[in-house]
């Protein structure tokens, strides 16, 4: 029997044996291991039978239980295997650090703030956009986490929301109330995944009781409403502009807005509009001759 066939029959790869040999020789050079994996063209998957399993206790001691939990749930969908990498767990650790630092940066401004849903429904401008993303994140999280069991995509939505909050520059007290709502939302959504840091932040924010006893928030349907949408405008099939229109606008209203836009006028001026095609909420195509 050829060596290659023997390895395949016993579910052993060249990469596994290379890693095993290095470990037996006492060599733990990560760069060398990565080099060998690149040259061989395969990586060594974790398996007890292959003696290359990561000790969870070591990972917890180095990065904390929350980081390990976050990394495992974020690395891949639950039905798929994944390759444990230092880069991956370090990325999870950095995210939790960023979240922790962000909370502490704004803690003095938001700790004593209280708000009601009805009150925040009246915010305008950037705060309104941020609030919409907060509640879209809640809706997506509940679907991914509770219905689809796609924990990795649920976590990705939380990460995206943190990016949005970091880009938000609150100026007024109402802005800071929206910021608090966003931070509380991230904390509540993280609590089943990273319970220790979530509990700590929940207490830092001045909330009473344990976060573990708090329900996952429900999305506010009013916050999810879109008042204005941006639609692409084509002239004779070629994209010429993107125009904002009311989300509930009828075709005649959209037509008036589009044809009065300077960027569109450039391509239709002096020509006959033969057709105006509006695919509601998605596309406008103006046919001219």
Curated annotation (Swiss-Prot):
UniProt keyword list: Aminoacyl-tRNA synthetase, ATP-binding, Cytoplasm, Ligase, Nucleotide-binding, Protein biosynthesis
Disulfide bridge positions per record: none
EC class name: ligase
Chain segments annotated as transmembrane: none
Catalytic activity, as annotated: tRNA(Leu) + L-leucine + ATP = L-leucyl-tRNA(Leu) + AMP + diphosphate
Family annotation (InterPro entries): aa-tRNA-synth_Ia, Leu-tRNA-ligase, M/V/L/I-tRNA-synth_anticd-bd, tRNAsynth_Ia_anticodon-bd
Keyword Ligase tagged: yes
Keyword Transcription regulation among UniProt keywords: no
GO cellular component: a single term: cytoplasm
Molecular function, one GO term: leucine-tRNA ligase activity
Binding site for ATP: 48
Position of sequence motif 'KMSKS' region: 45-49
Cell compartments where the protein resides: Cytoplasm
Pfam families membership: Anticodon_1, tRNA-synt_1
GO biological process, one term: leucyl-tRNA aminoacylation
EC number of the protein: 6.1.1.4
Quaternary organization: Seems to consist of an alpha chain and a beta chain.
Protein family per UniProt: Belongs to the class-I aminoacyl-tRNA synthetase family.
Protein name, entry field: Leucine--tRNA ligase subunit beta
Species of provenance: Aquifex aeolicus (strain VF5)
Taxonomy of the source species: Bacteria, Pseudomonadati, Aquificota, Aquificia, Aquificales
């Amino acid at each position: 029997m050829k060596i290659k066939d023997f390895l395949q029959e016993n579910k052993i790869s060249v990469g596994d044996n290379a890693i095993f040999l290095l470990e037996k020789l006492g060599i733990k050079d990560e760069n060398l291991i990565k080099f060998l994996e690149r040259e061989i063209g395969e990586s060594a998957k974790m398996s007890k039978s292959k003696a290359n399993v990561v000790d969870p206790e070591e990972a917890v001691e180095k990065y904390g239980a929350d980081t390990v939990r976050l990394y495992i749930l974020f690395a891949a969908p639950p039905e798929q295997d994944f390759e444990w990498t230092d880069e991956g767990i370090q990325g999870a650790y950095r995210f939790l650090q960023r979240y922790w630092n962000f909370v502490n940066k704004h803690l003095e401004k938001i700790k004593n703030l209280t708000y009601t849903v009805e009150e925040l429904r009246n915010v305008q401008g950037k705060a309104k956009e941020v609030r919409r993303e907060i509640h879209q994140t809640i809706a997506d999280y509940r679907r991914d986490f509770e219905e689809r069991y796609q924990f990795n995509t649920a976590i990705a939505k939380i990460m995206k929301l943190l990016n949005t909050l970091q880009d938000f520059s609150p100026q007024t007290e109402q802005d800071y109330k929206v910021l608090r709502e966003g931070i509380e939302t991230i904390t509540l959504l993280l609590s089943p995944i990273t319970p220790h840091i979530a509990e700590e932040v929940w207490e830092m924010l001045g909330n009473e009781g344990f976060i573990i006893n708090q329900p996952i928030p429900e999305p506010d349907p009013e916050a999810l409403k879109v008042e204005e949408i941006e639609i692409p405008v084509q002239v004779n099939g070629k994209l010429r502009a993107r125009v904002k229109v009311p989300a509930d606008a009828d075709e005649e209203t959209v037509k008036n807005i589009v044809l009065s836009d300077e960027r569109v006028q450039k391509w239709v001026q002096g020509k006959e509009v033969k057709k105006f095609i509006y695919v509601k909420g998605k596309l406008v195509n103006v046919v001219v001759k």
